[in-house]
């Protein structure tokens, strides 16, 4: 959402964070998990043209008064070059640890610069799969993202995308009925029939409190499991964890029940 704040950061900080990531990924792999790596959708520093005058960029404006990074035009040769370089270097740094890559070109704002979101999605996914033929694009369903137009760009390999219905316990998008939103359709569009995950967000900014939308997710998970054809599972997406254990314990119990939990 933002290109930077404060700094500069010492080189040792990057080295330490990289080693920490490697250790975390090793533990995940031992537990049979695949970490989600960063995907590439064209984000570049706002001064990229000072170093590469050939770069065709779309200015992305600001987010909460902070400068957003610029975005390469995805229909340019520069985008393909940068995307393949990104995935190549990331693999050199972390190794072949995962097939899952998360990126949201228009998270909480952004600017298409007149480009078609459908074309943007096609190019992002094509470059991801060129780097990793088993690649899965992780997309957050949050606010206006992903648009129906962006979801249409997944048609060539829809099974290589996974949408996280980020705040499903409060505002689910998987059953959206507006054809203009989230690939909605009468009866629920399931993101244009893209594999998706029912997620509980619950926590914002690490705030403490014993609260949550318990009835919503108890009934919501059961409803989705019974009615959805493309639900891949459930997950949590909090901004902080190690809090409110009752809520999380109950949430993960819901997937084992056909009718939801009895809250009485």
Question: Which residue stretches match the model-derived regions?
Answer:
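Catalytic-core regions of glycoside hydrolase
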Residues: 1-264
């Amino acid at each position: 959402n933002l290109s930077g704040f404060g700094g500069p950061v010492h080189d040792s900080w990057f080295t330490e964070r990289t080693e920490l990531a490697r250790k975390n990924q090793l533990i995940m792999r031992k537990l049979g998990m695949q970490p989600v790596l960063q995907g590439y959708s064209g984000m570049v520093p706002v001064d990229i043209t000072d170093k590469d005058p050939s770069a065709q960029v779309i200015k992305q404006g600001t987010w909460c008064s902070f400068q957003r990074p610029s975005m390469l035009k995805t229909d340019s040769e520069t985008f393909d070059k940068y995307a393949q370089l990104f995935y190549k270097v990331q693999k050199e740094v972390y190794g072949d640890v995962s097939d899952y890559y998360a990126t949201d070109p228009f998270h909480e704002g952004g600017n298409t610069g007149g480009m078609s979101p459908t074309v943007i999605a096609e190019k992002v996914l094509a470059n991801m799969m060129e780097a990793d033929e088993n690649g899965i694009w992780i997309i957050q369903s949050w606010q206006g993202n992903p648009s129906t137009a962006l979801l249409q760009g997944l048609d060539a390999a829809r099974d290589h995308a996974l949408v996280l219905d980020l705040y499903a316990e409060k505002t689910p998008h998987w059953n959206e009925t507006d054809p203009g939103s989230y690939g909605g359709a009468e009866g629920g569009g399931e993101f244009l029939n893209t594999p998706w995950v029912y997620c509980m967000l619950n926590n914002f900014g690490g705030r403490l409190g014993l609260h949550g939308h318990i009835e919503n997710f108890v009934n919501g998970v059961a409803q989705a499991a019974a009615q959805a054809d493309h639900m891949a599972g459930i997950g949590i997406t909090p901004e902080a964890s190690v809090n409110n254990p009752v809520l999380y314990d109950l949430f993960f119990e819901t997937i084992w029940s056909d009718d939801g939990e009895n809250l009485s």
